[in-house]
C-alpha cells in the first residue's frame, strides 16, 4: 500500500522527456498526462500515469486534486540568498538619476550589503535567509542555489557559507552552495585584483575539505574581473575539484559566454550582452545559459538577454530569480516566468522547461530534480490552475496551492508550518 496517492490531476506535467539538457524543439515540448495520478511511498515517487493505469492502487492517504495541475518542484539556479540588511533607501536615488558609482561613494550599493552582512551574526543571517526560503517555497520552489559574495573577505565569506550549510539542515528546500568570493574587488585591493583572487583561491582547499561549497563563481565584467582573470581563477578552482559558474556579459559583450563554453562551466549567467559568437559557442557546449530577466526589469533597462535567439540556435536556457537585495529583490520565480515570456519571447512550454529540467542541470541536479519520474524524490506542486499556460499568463500573484517536499506537505496556501522564521 502506498503512503499517498494524488488523483484527479487535470494536467500532470512530468517534464520527463529525453535525459540531458533540453534544446530547440525539446524546450518547446511538455510531456503532459491528462487525468493523471502520482503515487508516493517512503518520500519517493513510485507511480506516474493515467487514472486508467492507476486502477487498483491503494494508499493510506488519497488526495483529490480537483482537476488542477501538478508539476515538479521548481528549481531556482541563481540566488544570492544569504545577506544582511536591505536597500530600499536607494530607490529614490535611482529614480533621481543618481549614478551607481555615486551611490557607492555614499556607502550604498553592494558596499551597503557587504557592511550589513559583516555586522550580522551567523544566526541572524540564517533567520533572515529562512524568511526568504519560506517565500520561495510558497512560490513552488523546492531546490535553490545559494551564493556567498557579500563578504569580500575570508571571515564573512566563511560565515555566509556556514549559514547556508545550517540552512540545508534546518529548511526543507534543497540548497546548492556556491562560493562567490570574487563578486567585486574590495577598495583595499583596488588595482590589485590578481592578489585578491589569489587570496580567494587560498580559501578553496579548506572549503573543499569542509564541503561548504560545490561551485565556485566569479563576476566577469568591465571594471571587475577580466575574461583572462576569470578563466584562470575558475580553471584553478576546477583543478581543486569544484564545478564552476560565471557571471558573464551582464552589461558588455566582454567574452564571458565564450569563456564559459571554453572552460566547460556548468552555467553562464546573465548574458544580456552576450555576442553572437558567444551564443554559438554556448550552443555547441554543455554550459547552461541561466537568464535573469527579473534583474533587467528591476534595473529598468531596455535590452534583455536574447533568449529567443539563444533557444533557436540550440542553447540550453534556464531561468532564475537572481534574488538579491540590490538588483532583483524578489523570490517570485513565477514573476520571472512571466517576464521571460514577455521580454525574452519564450513560449510557456520553454519557460516551464527553463525552471525545471534545464535549471536543474545548471546546478548539477539533473538526475534528482526537475522531473516527475518513478524513483525520484517526491517534490511536487499542486497549482490553482487547470493548464500550464495560465501560470505565466496571469502574472504578479502566486498560483501555488500545495507543495510536497520529499513526499511531505511543506506548504499549503494560508499556512506556514515549515518554519517560524523572522525578519
Curated annotation (Swiss-Prot):
Gene3D superfamilies to which the protein is assigned, alphabetical: Metal-dependent hydrolases, Urease, subunit C, domain 1
Binding site for 4-imidazolone-5-propanoate: 87, 150, 183, 250, 327
GO cellular component entries: cytoplasm
Reactions catalysed, as given in the entry: 4-imidazolone-5-propanoate + H2O = N-formimidoyl-L-glutamate
Taxonomy of the source species: Bacteria, Bacillati, Bacillota, Bacilli, Bacillales
GO biological process annotation, one example: L-histidine catabolic process to glutamate and formate
Residue positions binding N-formimidoyl-L-glutamate: 150, 324, 326
UniProt-recorded Gene Ontology molecular function terms: imidazolonepropionase activity; iron ion binding; zinc ion binding
Annotated family: Belongs to the metallo-dependent hydrolases superfamily. HutI family.
Protein name according to UniProt: Imidazolonepropionase
Record: residues binding Zn(2+): 78, 80, 247, 322
EC number(s) reported in the record: 3.5.2.7
Gene (name only): hutI
Stretches of the chain forming a coiled coil according to its record: none
Necessary cofactors: Zn(2+); Fe(3+)
Record note on cofactor: Binds 1 zinc or iron ion per subunit.
Transmembrane stretches, start-end: none
Subcellular location: Cytoplasm
Pathway noted in the entry: Amino-acid degradation; L-histidine degradation into L-glutamate; N-formimidoyl-L-glutamate from L-histidine: step 3/3
Broadest EC class assigned to this enzyme: hydrolase
Cited NCBIfam families: hutI (TIGR01224)
Binding site for Fe(3+): 78, 80, 247, 322
Function statement: Catalyzes the hydrolytic cleavage of the carbon-nitrogen bond in imidazolone-5-propanoate to yield N-formimidoyl-L-glutamate. It is the third step in the universal histidine degradation pathway.
Organism: Bacillus cereus (strain G9842)
Domain of life: Bacteria
Alphabetically ordered keywords of this record: Cytoplasm, Histidine metabolism, Hydrolase, Iron, Metal-binding, Zinc
Amino acid at each position: 500500500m502506498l503512503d499517498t496517492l494524488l488523483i484527479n490531476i487535470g494536467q500532470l506535467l512530468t517534464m520527463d522527456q529525453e535525459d540531458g539538457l533540453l534544446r530547440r524543439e525539446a524546450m518547446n515540448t511538455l510531456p503532459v498526462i491528462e487525468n493523471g495520478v502520482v503515487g508516493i511511498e517512503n518520500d519517493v515517487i513510485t507511480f506516474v500515469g493515467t487514472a486508467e493505469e492507476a486502477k487498483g492502487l491503494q494508499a493510506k492517504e488519497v488526495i483529490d486534486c480537483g482537476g488542477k495541475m501538478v508539476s515538479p518542484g521548481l528549481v531556482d539556479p541563481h540566488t544570492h540568498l544569504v545577506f544582511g540588511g536591505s536597500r530600499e533607501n536607494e530607490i529614490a536615488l535611482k529614480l533621481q538619476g543618481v549614478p551607481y558609482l555615486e551611490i557607492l561613494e555614499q556607502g550604498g550599493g553592494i558596499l551597503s550589503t557587504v557592511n550589513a552582512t559583516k555586522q550580522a551574526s551567523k544566526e541572524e543571517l540564517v533567520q533572515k535567509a529562512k524568511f526568504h526560503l519560506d517565500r520561495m517555497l510558497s512560490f513552488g520552489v523546492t531546490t535553490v542555489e545559494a551564493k556567498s559574495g557579500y563578504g569580500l573577505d575570508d571571515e564573512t565569506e566563511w560565515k555566509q557559507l556556514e549559514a547556508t550549510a545550517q540552512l540545508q539542515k534546518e529548511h526543507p528546500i534543497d540548497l546548492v552552495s556556491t562560493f562567490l568570493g570574487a563578486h567585486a574587488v574590495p577598495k583595499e585591493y583596488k588595482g590589485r585584483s590578481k592578489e585578491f583572487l589569489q587570496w580567494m583561491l587560498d580559501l578553496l582547499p579548506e572549503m573543499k575539505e569542509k564541503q561548504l561549497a560545490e561551485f565556485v563563481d566569479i563576476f566577469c565584467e568591465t571594471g571587475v574581473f577580466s575574461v583572462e582573470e576569470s578563466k584562470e581563477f575558475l580553471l584553478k578552482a576546477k583543478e581543486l575539484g569544484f564545478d564552476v559558474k560565471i557571471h558573464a556579459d551582464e552589461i558588455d559583450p566582454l567574452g564571458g559566454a565564450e569563456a564559459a563554453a571554453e572552460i566547460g562551466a556548468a552555467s553562464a549567467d546573465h548574458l544580456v550582452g552576450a555576442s553572437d559568437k558567444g551564443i554559438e559557442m554556448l550552443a555547441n557546449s554543455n554550459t547552461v545559459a541561466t537568464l535573469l530577466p527579473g534583474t533587467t526589469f528591476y534595473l529598468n533597462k531596455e535590452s534583455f538577454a536574447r533568449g529567443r535567439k539563444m533557444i533557436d540556435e540550440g542553447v540550453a536556457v534556464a531561468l532564475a530569480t537572481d534574488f538579491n537585495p540590490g538588483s532583483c529583490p524578489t523570490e517570485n520565480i513565477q514573476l520571472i516566468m512571466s517576464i521571460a515570456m514577455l521580454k525574452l519571447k519564450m513560449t510557456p512550454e520553454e519557460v516551464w522547461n527553463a525552471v525545471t529540467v534545464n535549471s536543474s542541470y545548471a546546478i548539477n541536479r539533473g538526475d534528482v530534480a526537475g522531473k516527475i519520474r518513478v524513483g525520484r524524490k517526491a517534490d511536487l506542486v499542486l497549482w490553482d490552475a487547470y493548464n500550464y499556460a495560465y501560470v505565466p499568463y496571469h502574472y504578479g500573484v502566486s498560483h501555488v496551492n500545495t507543495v510536497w517536499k520529499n513526499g511531505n506537505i511543506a506548504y499549503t496556501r494560508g499556512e506556514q508550518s515549515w518554519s517560524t522564521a523572522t525578519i
